[in-house]
Amino acid sequence: MMDGIRIDVLSVIPGFFDSVLDNGLLAIARKKGYADIVVHNLHDYGLGRYRQVDDSPFGGGAGMVLRPEPVFACVEKLQSERCYDAVIFPTPDARPFLQGDANRLSRMKNLMFLCGHYKALDERVRQSLVTMEYSIGDVVLSGGEIPSLLMMDALLRVVPGVLGDSESALTDSFQTGMLDCAYYTRPPEFRGMKVPEVLLSGHHAKIEQWRQENALERTRRLRPDLLGEDVE
């Protein structure tokens, strides 16, 4: 393949990724050679006859904790094969993952995503192996698989050549610090709802002005925090 991004994903449920990697943008990025995504089963590095990867937390309490040994074994094996720019752990107790983060990650060559599961990940893994932590929002999921896919999609769509129209990614929401404007397509009128006349005018300067004004209005109404304004 061409000199694309190598992404290794560590998970206790690797089959979760099968359908997603074979469809949509991630499949396109792989087919075009812009990404090489490999999923690793942490159970292959588990302990004992039953390949144990979790255990109860010290101090008691509900839930199970992902043990350090399988994670260290898998990460260190991969690190012996290549140098990683980042070992990423999606977790709700981290700063938000933003568009700027996706842009930065898209310029890296070797990334590793560590998908947590169960109640928690042993803290020693986070202290010793993880180099970046991101939250996708104030919500708790059953594992890091969905957040990892979200981040992979976000970073790969801004890699030049992945999308059919690279300019499309550059005009997305947040790329300019605001939400994107509204979009319309055919027909020009549907069930009494009309497309704004300016978009049908063919006057490019006026269309661009409308889009900027619409984006500003939508941002002020939906995400005033992006403009530094108070949120009601």
Curated annotation (Swiss-Prot):
Keyword annotations of the record: Cytoplasm, Methyltransferase, S-adenosyl-L-methionine, Transferase, tRNA processing
Record bears the keyword Transport: no
User: Looking at its record, which EC class is this enzyme?
Assistant: transferase
GO CC field? cytosol
Protein encoded by which gene: trmD
Q: What is this protein called?
A: tRNA (guanine-N(1)-)-methyltransferase
Establish whether keyword Cytoplasm is in the entry.
yes
A GO biological process held by the record: tRNA N1-guanine methylation
- Domain of life of the organism in this record? Bacteria
Q: Which Pfam families match?
A: tRNA_m1G_MT
> Per the UniProt entry, what species is this protein from, by scientific name?
Chlorobium luteolum (strain DSM 273 / BCRC 81028 / 2530) (Pelodictyon luteolum)
